[in-house]
Amino acid sequence: MKEKTTQLYEGAYVFSVTLSEEARRKALEKVTSGITNYGGEILKIHDQGRKKLAYTIRGAREGYYYLIYFTVVPGVIAELWKEYHLNEDLLRFLTLKTDAVKEVLEFASLPE
C-alpha cells in the first residue's frame, strides 16, 4: 500500500476585527482543528496582530492576521478551502506550498 506524502504549507488567515478575543481564539481554533482533523500537523503559528487591510472586505478596513505553517496531504487543501469559505469570521485566506518554516518573520520597509 502506498503511503501518502504530506506537503508543508504556509497559510495566511485574516479574521474580522469585530470578534472578541475569545471569539477570535475560537475562530483560529476552528481553522487549526480543521487541519488536524484531516490528519495534518500544525508546526508554527505567528500572530501578526491587527493590521490595516489593503482594501475594504465586507465593510472591514482592518483585520487580525495569522500565519500558520502546517503539513497535510495535498488532496486535503481543497476540502479545507471549502470549510474556509463557510467560515463567516474569516475575511480572507491564502494557502501556499513552502519549503521551510520561518521561525522569525521579516518584512521589508516600503520605499518613501
UniProtKB/Swiss-Prot annotation:
The UniProt record lists the keyword DNA repair: no
Gene Ontology terms describing biological process: translation
Sample GO molecular function, one term: structural constituent of ribosome
Top-level taxon of origin: Bacteria
Keyword entries, A-Z: Ribonucleoprotein, Ribosomal protein, RNA-binding, rRNA-binding
Pfam family membership, one: Ribosomal_S6
One Gene Ontology term, aspect cellular component: ribonucleoprotein complex
Alphabetical list of Gene3D superfamilies matching this protein: 3.30.70.60
PANTHER family reported for this sequence: MITOCHONDRIAL 28S RIBOSOMAL PROTEIN S6, SMALL RIBOSOMAL SUBUNIT PROTEIN BS6M
Family designation: Belongs to the bacterial ribosomal protein bS6 family.
NCBIfam families attached to this UniProt entry: S6
UniProt xrefs under HAMAP family: Ribosomal_bS6 (MF_00360)
Main function: Binds together with bS18 to 16S ribosomal RNA.
Name under which the protein is recorded: Small ribosomal subunit protein bS6
Organism (species): Chlamydia abortus (strain DSM 27085 / S26/3)
